[in-house]
A protein has these predicted regions:
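Secondary-structure transition/capping motifs at alpha-helix termini
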Residues: 1-2, 39
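Catalytic palm active-site di-aspartate
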Residues: 2-20, 59
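Short, glycine/acidic-rich beta->alpha junctions
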Residues: 7, 27, 101
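Short, well-ordered coil/turn residues at beta-beta hairpins
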Residues: 18, 38-39, 61, 138-141, ...
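Polymerase palm active-site segment centered on the conserved acidic dipeptide of motif C
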Residues: 21-81, 106, 116, 123
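Conserved NTP-donor binding/palm subdomain of two-metal-ion nucleotidyltransferases/polymerases, i.e.
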Residues: 69-109
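C-terminal, non-catalytic extensions of nucleic-acid polymerases
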Residues: 95-216
Length: 216
């Protein structure tokens, strides 16, 4: 591993190592286990690849949101499953709409101009009406950390052509399919009180006994 030119990106859990030349791959594979072991880590090495659009880091892949501007975007399948689920207890319709507003604002900040994602978070904002997020909807220490790091902020905007093509290359959803999904989100409605759903009606046994709202 020593002497091999590379770029390393890590978050304490996942790590990506990028090499400038595929010919260096064999040298890297020969030394990576020992190199990490010297620092006290037993490292699991996954498959390598040369397709930049399939580079995966913390369940995100690179999307060219504007020509020359890249953004790591969450996997839509896992992201939407999580973004539809609330761990905040709702006692009223206002609680529900306040939660929708919080998710909308957070989603806009990280993916407002990303295909499919932007449309979902815009729909949440529309459904929230005039509700305002509650303090317990925010992870304040994380927000402060992001501010100190100077993390960028995105805004709702129509996805660019490059974003649609890049999103397709990363996740296999064609530009036409993206627009159809966005149309579905634009028609999304909610109701109160929530209805109980069982695992037989949704994808995921962990949802047994969870509650959802009409129309989602």
């Amino acid at each position: 591993m020593k002497g091999v030119q590379c770029a390393i990106f890590g978050d304490g859990d996942d790590t990506i190592i990028m090499l400038p030349d595929e010919r260096m791959l064999q040298w890297y594979l020969m030394g990576v286990d020992a190199w990490f072991l010297e620092m006290g880590f037993v490292m699991k090495v996954e498959a390598f690849g040369s397709d930049f659009s399939q580079l995966e880091f913390c369940q995100t892949r690179p999307i060219e949101v504007r020509p020359g501007e890249w953004l790591m975007v969450r996997n839509p399948k896992s992201a939407f499953a999580k973004d539809h689920h609330s761990q905040t207890f709702w006692t009223s319709e206002l609680d529900m709409r306040a939660w929708l507003k919080a998710v909308s604002e957070g989603g806009e900040a990280i993916a407002g101009d990303v295909p499919v994602f932007g449309a979902l978070y815009q729909a949440y904002g529309r459904l929230a009406g005039n509700a305002r997020p509650r303090a317990d909807h925010y992870d304040l220490p994380y927000v402060m950390l992001q501010m100190r790091m100077g993390a960028g902020r995105r805004y709702f905007a129509r996805p660019s052509d490059s974003a649609r093509v890049s999103f397709y290359e990363a996740y296999g959803i064609t530009p036409g399919e993206q627009q159809l999904i966005e149309d579905e989100f634009s028609d999304l409605e909610v109701g109160w009180p929530p209805e109980r759903v069982d695992a037989a009606n949704v994808d995921g046994s962990y949802l047994v006994g969870c509650r959802t709202w009409i129309g989602l």
